[in-house]
Structure formats: C-alpha cells, structure tokens
C-alpha cells in the first residue's frame, strides 16, 4: 500500500544526495578564516554552513525520521548533527559511530581505508587546541613525518565509500601528504602544549655539522698536542675569538697543510689571523686580556693600534716604548693596575739597557728601499710555484719556497739550508769565526741511523778546525738550533719556545766523540765538555706559532758573529722581507 510512498522518498533522497554543493568553492571563500596547520578531520564540520546545506540536512533528517516511523531499512551515511545550545556549532557523533557497520578487523585489514587516530585535547567547537602533525606509515615505505598544511575540510569534501564509510579527500593545493599505493595508516599527533611547531630537521645540515665538529675536534687535538708535547711547537698567538673567524677556520680557509717539493717540513699555515707583536711582557698581558671576557679600555686599544702600525713599518719600538705606554695609560684613571706594573718592568729594562745595545738594535732595523720592496713583492706574488728564483750551494729556491717567508708562514728546509750557507759564506769573507753548518736533514739521519749513517757527511771537512758548528734541529713541527762552540767546549740548545734539549745535546756530543776517533784517532775528554739548554729569559722567545724557523735563522746569524742576541718578536716581519732579498741576491745585508 505504501510502496509508492517509499519510492517517492527514495527518489527525493537520491536527488538530495547528488545536489551537494562543491567543497572547493567553500574552501576558497573561507580560506582566510582557516587555521594554517589544522588537519583533515572527517568528523569535524565547520560551525557555519550555507543555507542550502542546512536545507539539505533538514530534508535528510525528515526522510530519516519518516523511514524510521514506517520501519523501512533506510541507512544514512552520517548521523544527524546536533546543534550546540551554547555557541551554535554543530558536533558530530564519535568516529566509532561513523563506522558502526564495520568491524575492527575489517577496518585494519583493508588496503584502501585509513584509520584516523586523534590525540590531544579538543575545544568545544571540535577543533584541536594544539597544532597537529600527520604521520604516514606504510608497509613498504619508511616512516615519514610531514607537517599538515591542509585547511579544515567540510563534510562535503568526503567521498562516500562502499559499506557506508567515508574516505577523507585532501586538498591538492595545501596537502603535502604522499599517497602510497600500499596500505597507509594516518595518525594525528598533537604536539606538547606551548612548544609550537619546530624547525624541520635537515639530514644534510646534520652531516655538515658533524663534519665541522670532527674537523674542529682534530684541530683542537693537534693544537693541544703542540701545546703540551715535548717535541712540538706550542701555539701562543692570539686568534680572533669571534664565532665568524672560528667557522672560517673550520671550513679550511684559515688553516692549511702543504708539502713543498718533498721536504719534510709540514706547512701548517694560519692564513687569516693578525697579531699585534710587541715586547714580551706587554704582549703576554694583552694575550691574557683578550682571553678574558672583560672589556678592553680605549687607551689600551689606542696603544695597540700604535704598536701595530709601527711594527708594520718596521720601526724600532724599544727606546720610547715605556714613555709611550705610560703616557697613554695615565690618560685614563681607570687603567688596569696589572698593566701599570708590566709597563714599569719594561721601563726598568729600558733604563738598564746601554746605549751601545740600543745602537745595535737600530743597526739591525735597516729600512728597505722602494726597489727592494718591489722586488720582494714580486717574489712573494703570484706566479708558477716551481719557478726557480735563486740557485746556489747545490740548492734551488723556487717561488713556492720563497713564499714560505710570507708573514705567519712556516719556513721549510730549503730556505733554512740556503740561509745557513749564506752565513758560512759571509763568515769566510768578512773575517768572522770559522763556521760550519750542518743540513737540516743531518740530525734526523744521525738519530735514526747512528754515526755510520752520517759518517761521510764530513768528507773533506775537519770539524775540529772550526770554531762554531751550527746544527738546525727539526722536531716534528718546530725548529730549534744547537750551537757547538769548539773554543769553549760547550753545546747550547736554543729554542724559541723555551723547551729543553738535553737529549739532543747528548746525541751530538756522542757524534763528536765518534768523529774524533775516526778523523783524529783520539777520544774527547767528555769531562771538559758541557751542554745546557738556554732558558727563556736568556734568549728572545717567539710570541706566535709560526716564527720558530725565523728565530732559528736569526739565532744562527747573531751567534755566528759572536754578537749578543738582541732582536725581538716584532722585528720578524722585517726580517722575513730582508731574507727574501738576501736569498734572491745570495748576499746578506
């Protein structure tokens, strides 16, 4: 009797189901009111709906009630929404009621349906309080965690699937979810309260950081070894403490290791640091102040600038150093008391210094002419590294060898051996003490192979007819010098870092004993011979980690003339330039 009524109602229901307005138009119109990081939730329906949508749901509710009244098996895909009395928003039934006709096994076993699991608190209008992250887990794909940039979708954006289930349809403009072909389980994970979204972690960036940390760790280990080892050169120079210079150093722009023409000297060159070089006490104090976190006063900055400018020009600082520093420091009442004490020590040393010694220092600092400066600049400039610039004493000095004389570079064996031969030639011509100099490779050969390994090194030379014998010592990354004075029967070890060389002196003394037996058929009276290491206060000390080779050469220069060693660290830039010119012209200034 009522079959015609059922057919009419079914026709109306199908018509209403097809006339649902499109969801994209609503999304484009409501995009400004959407939350950026809200997720696709099939159970959430926005509070405001178009009037046509409300009319359709009212028709559906009426049909649902009519079907229930007559007892016909009429099923809807969604249950009627209940309007909240407090804020007018619509709340839907729990997700478990949406899939009321499906079992849990069927839900998890299907390869095309998603399981929406929600964590975290929700506000009364059905929107999560915290931002969510979409987690996609597939059987054949690794787990991926991607932030959800989708907008909140309306219920019309969900397509009806067989069996009364709904499948969420993502927004192609905003969703970043990769859809695998295999089964996927989507989880909605709420972040902790108050933390918000974190910056995505980049695997490549992590690898770069690990690589930089590894380089930095190796550099620190090397510097630590050079600072505490017995046979290496401690680095005491002041580097820029800013983070920018540290990163430049870790990126291998500030440090480099080279090998020049197969020689054994490692070129570990700091290329980008600047050092204000003054006398020992003042410079050591400035080093302490740089390491501290306190501020440097303006007067100290002015003094440092003045010292740096004059050291670059190669002027002498000792005669008026105390007056300049004391005058500058008295300008400010807040000067450091420790700095005053250091300056007073310098003043005392300057007063005790004789006029002749000051004259000697002045004679050492001969200014270079413009032509000499140009020639030096050309040699240190760009050009083929294997270009031979000077050849003598069976040695060839290339442009690469000369460029080790740049500021803050380490000298190699070729440069040191060439300069030592220039000292021998100078002593022969100018009537200085008879001098013999061993090669830088002599001591390593003697230490490793004994006397028989170097027996022929003195063929045609009688060492005991000489007055002074110089032996350059290379200890891994540090240069030093041993002076054998046959007139006084003593051996002296000179190290610009204050290290001791008793073992080195003993090896060389034993070599003299073997040489005396071979050449003179007589033993040395070892009781008459003495050896000791020069203490730091007895000879000038380097204030950086790159001038050990220069100090070794200048030790040899002064000692070969029986001249007191009076040079200082701040003269090294000028000495380097002079040495370039001397090697090019094969003549000492």
UniProtKB/Swiss-Prot annotation:
<feature type="modified residue" description="Phosphoserine">
    <location>
        <position position="333"/>
    </location>
</feature>
<dbReference type="GO" id="GO:0031965">
    <property type="term" value="C:nuclear membrane"/>
</dbReference>
<dbReference type="GO" id="GO:0031398">
    <property type="term" value="P:positive regulation of protein ubiquitination"/>
</dbReference>
<dbReference type="GO" id="GO:0045444">
    <property type="term" value="P:fat cell differentiation"/>
</dbReference>
<dbReference type="GO" id="GO:0005654">
    <property type="term" value="C:nucleoplasm"/>
</dbReference>
<dbReference type="Pfam" id="PF02902">
    <property type="entry name" value="Peptidase_C48"/>
</dbReference>
<dbReference type="GO" id="GO:0007507">
    <property type="term" value="P:heart development"/>
</dbReference>
<dbReference type="GO" id="GO:0060707">
    <property type="term" value="P:trophoblast giant cell differentiation"/>
</dbReference>
<dbReference type="GO" id="GO:0051028">
    <property type="term" value="P:mRNA transport"/>
</dbReference>
<dbReference type="GO" id="GO:0005634">
    <property type="term" value="C:nucleus"/>
</dbReference>
<dbReference type="GO" id="GO:0016926">
    <property type="term" value="P:protein desumoylation"/>
</dbReference>
<dbReference type="GO" id="GO:0070139">
    <property type="term" value="F:SUMO-specific endopeptidase activity"/>
</dbReference>
<keyword id="KW-0539">Nucleus</keyword>
<dbReference type="GO" id="GO:0015031">
    <property type="term" value="P:protein transport"/>
</dbReference>
<dbReference type="GO" id="GO:0006508">
    <property type="term" value="P:proteolysis"/>
</dbReference>
<dbReference type="GO" id="GO:0031397">
    <property type="term" value="P:negative regulation of protein ubiquitination"/>
</dbReference>
<dbReference type="GO" id="GO:0030111">
    <property type="term" value="P:regulation of Wnt signaling pathway"/>
</dbReference>
<keyword id="KW-0963">Cytoplasm</keyword>
<keyword id="KW-0833">Ubl conjugation pathway</keyword>
<keyword id="KW-0653">Protein transport</keyword>
<keyword id="KW-0906">Nuclear pore complex</keyword>
<dbReference type="GO" id="GO:0005643">
    <property type="term" value="C:nuclear pore"/>
</dbReference>
<keyword id="KW-0378">Hydrolase</keyword>
<feature type="active site">
    <location>
        <position position="495"/>
    </location>
</feature>
<feature type="short sequence motif" description="Nuclear localization signal">
    <location>
        <begin position="46"/>
        <end position="51"/>
    </location>
</feature>
<dbReference type="GO" id="GO:0005829">
    <property type="term" value="C:cytosol"/>
</dbReference>
<keyword id="KW-0597">Phosphoprotein</keyword>
<keyword id="KW-0472">Membrane</keyword>
<dbReference type="GO" id="GO:2000045">
    <property type="term" value="P:regulation of G1/S transition of mitotic cell cycle"/>
</dbReference>
<dbReference type="GO" id="GO:0031648">
    <property type="term" value="P:protein destabilization"/>
</dbReference>
<feature type="short sequence motif" description="Nuclear localization signal">
    <location>
        <begin position="28"/>
        <end position="31"/>
    </location>
</feature>
<keyword id="KW-0645">Protease</keyword>
<feature type="region of interest" description="Disordered">
    <location>
        <begin position="155"/>
        <end position="176"/>
    </location>
</feature>
<dbReference type="InterPro" id="IPR003653">
    <property type="entry name" value="Peptidase_C48_C"/>
</dbReference>
<dbReference type="GO" id="GO:0060711">
    <property type="term" value="P:labyrinthine layer development"/>
</dbReference>
<comment type="function">
    <text>Protease that catalyzes two essential functions in the SUMO pathway. The first is the hydrolysis of an alpha-linked peptide bond at the C-terminal end of the small ubiquitin-like modifier (SUMO) propeptides, SUMO1, SUMO2 and SUMO3 leading to the mature form of the proteins. The second is the deconjugation of SUMO1, SUMO2 and SUMO3 from targeted proteins, by cleaving an epsilon-linked peptide bond between the C-terminal glycine of the mature SUMO and the lysine epsilon-amino group of the target protein. May down-regulate CTNNB1 levels and thereby modulate the Wnt pathway.</text>
</comment>
<keyword id="KW-0811">Translocation</keyword>
<comment type="similarity">
    <text>Belongs to the peptidase C48 family.</text>
</comment>
<feature type="active site" description="Nucleophile">
    <location>
        <position position="548"/>
    </location>
</feature>
<keyword id="KW-0788">Thiol protease</keyword>
<feature type="short sequence motif" description="Nuclear export signal">
    <location>
        <begin position="317"/>
        <end position="332"/>
    </location>
</feature>
<keyword id="KW-0813">Transport</keyword>
């Amino acid at each position: 009797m009522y079959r015609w009524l059922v057919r009419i109602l079914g026709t109306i229901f199908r018509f209403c189901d097809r006339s649902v307005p499109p969801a994209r138009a609503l999304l484009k119109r409501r995009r400004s009111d959407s939350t950026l990081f809200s997720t696709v939730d099939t159970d959430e329906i926005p509070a405001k709906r178009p009037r046509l949508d409300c009319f359709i749901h009212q028709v559906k509710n009426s049909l649902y009630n009519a079907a229930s009244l007559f007892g016909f098996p009429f099923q809807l895909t969604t249950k009627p929404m209940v309007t909240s009395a407090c804020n007018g928003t619509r709340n839907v039934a729990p997700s478990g009621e949406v899939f009321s006709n499906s079992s849990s096994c069927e839900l998890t076993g299907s390869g095309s349906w998603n399981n929406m699991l929600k964590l975290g608190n929700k506000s009364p209008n059905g929107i999560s309080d915290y931002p969510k992250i979409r987690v996609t887990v597939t059987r054949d794909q690794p787990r991926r965690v991607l932030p959800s940039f989708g907008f909140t979708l309306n219920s019309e954006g969900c397509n009806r699937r067989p069996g009364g289930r709904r499948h969420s349809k993502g927004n192609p403009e905003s969703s970043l979810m990769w859809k695998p072909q295999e089964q996927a389980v989507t989880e909605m994970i709420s972040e902790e309260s108050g933390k918000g979204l974190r910056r995505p972690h980049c695997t490549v960036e992590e690898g770069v950081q690990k690589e930089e940390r590894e380089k930095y760790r190796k550099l620190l280990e090397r510097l630590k070894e050079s600072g505490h080892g017995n046979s290496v050169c401690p680095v005491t120079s002041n580097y820029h403490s800013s983070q920018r210079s540290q990163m430049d150093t870790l990126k291998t722009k500030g440090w480099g290791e080279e090998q020049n023409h197969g020689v054994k000297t490692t070129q570990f060159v700091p290329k980008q640091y600047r050092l204000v070089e003054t006398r020992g006490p003042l410079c050591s104090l400035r080093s302490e102040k740089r390491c501290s976190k306190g501020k440097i006063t303006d007067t100290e900055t002015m003094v440092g600038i003045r010292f740096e400018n004059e050291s670059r020009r190669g002027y002498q600082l000792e005669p008026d150093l105390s007056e300049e520093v004391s005058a500058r420091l008295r300008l400010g009442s807040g000067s450091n008391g420790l700095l005053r004490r250091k300056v007073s020590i310098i003043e005392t040393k300057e007063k005790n210094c004789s006029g002749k010694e000051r004259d000697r220092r002045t004679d050492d600092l001969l200014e270079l002419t413009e032509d000499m400066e140009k020639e030096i600049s050309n040699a240190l400039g760009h050009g083929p590294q294997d270009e031979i610039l000077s050849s003598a004493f069976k040695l060839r000095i290339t442009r690469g060898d000369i460029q080790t004389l740049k500021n803050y570079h380490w000298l190699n064996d070729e440069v040191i051996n060439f300069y030592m031969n220039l000292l021998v030639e100078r002593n022969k011509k100018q009537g200085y003490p008879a001098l013999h100099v061993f090669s830088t490779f002599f001591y390593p050969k003697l230490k490793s192979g004994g006397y028989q390994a170097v027996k022929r090194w003195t063929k045609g030379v009688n060492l005991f007819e000489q007055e002074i014998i110089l032996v350059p010592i290379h200890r891994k990354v540090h240069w030093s010098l041993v002076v054998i004075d046959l007139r006084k029967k003593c051996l002296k070890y000179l190290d610009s870092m204050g290290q001791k060389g008793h073992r080195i002196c003993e090896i060389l003394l034993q070599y003299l004993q073997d040489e005396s037996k071979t050449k003179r058929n007589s033993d040395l009276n070892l009781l008459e011979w003495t050896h000791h290491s020069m203490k730091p206060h007895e000879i000038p000390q380097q204030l950086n980690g790159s001038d050990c080779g220069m100090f070794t050469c200048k030790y040899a220069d002064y000692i070969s003339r029986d001249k007191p060693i009076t040079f200082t660290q701040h003269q090294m830039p000028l000495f380097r330039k002079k040495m370039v010119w001397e090697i090019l012209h094969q003549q000492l200034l």
